[in-house]
Each structure stands twice: as C-alpha cells, then as structure tokens.
C-alpha cells in the first residue's frame, strides 16, 4: 500500500530535520492519509479510498465526491479513482440521454 493520496496524488516529501546546533539530518514528511468511505450519489454505492485530510476538505469544497471526481484531472487520480470516475460519467450520460 503506497503512501499516496488516491484523489490528489499527495506523496511523501524529503527534507531535513534541523537541530538546535543547525545539524541537518534527512527525514521524510509523510502525508496524513486516512481510510474513508465516500457515498457516490450517481452510483448509489459506497466507495472506499485512502485519501489525505487535505483531499477531504477539497471534496467538501467542491460539492461532494461525485463533483470532485468529475472536476479532477486524471493525472492526479489513482487507477481505482479513474475507474470510479468513468463509471460515474457513464451513469450520468445514461440518465441524461
């Protein structure tokens, strides 16, 4: 299981831990990832993803899980999220047409 957000592609960063005497040692800054179950309105089913807490705020800001996925770029999404996005688009096209 990688330490990468499935919605925003937020990943670990590398930097320095700096002591009081200014000695620098390498360290990793890990994203705050949580396992979340989103409810897709279009699919009417729960979707379980591993996302960052920043992504949770972004999903709320954009108006829900379906709206977030439809506005998101495929380059930022995981393969699982891209497949869910395609299913949502297909379902909405079937309902509209």
UniProtKB/Swiss-Prot annotation:
Keywords from the UniProt entry: Ribonucleoprotein, Ribosomal protein
Gene Ontology terms for molecular function: structural constituent of ribosome
InterPro entries, A to Z: Ribosomal_bL28, Ribosomal_bL28/bL31-like_sf, Ribosomal_bL28_bact-type, Ribosomal_bL28_sf
Keyword Ribosomal protein: yes
GO process annotations (BP): translation
Family: Belongs to the bacterial ribosomal protein bL28 family.
UniProt-listed HAMAP family: Ribosomal_bL28
Name of protein: Large ribosomal subunit protein bL28
């Amino acid at each position: 299981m990688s330490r990468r957000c499935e919605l925003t592609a937020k990943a670990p960063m590398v930097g320095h831990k700096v002591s009081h005497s200014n000695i620098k040692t390498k360290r990793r800054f890990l994203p705050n990832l949580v396992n979340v179950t989103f409810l897709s309105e279009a699919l009417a089913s729960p979707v379980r993803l591993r996302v960052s807490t920043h992504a949770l705020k972004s999903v709320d800001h954009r108006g829900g899980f379906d709206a977030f996925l439809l506005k998101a770029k495929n380059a930022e999404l995981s393969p699982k999220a891209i497949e869910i996005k395609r299913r949502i688009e297909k379902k909405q096209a079937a309902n509209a047409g």
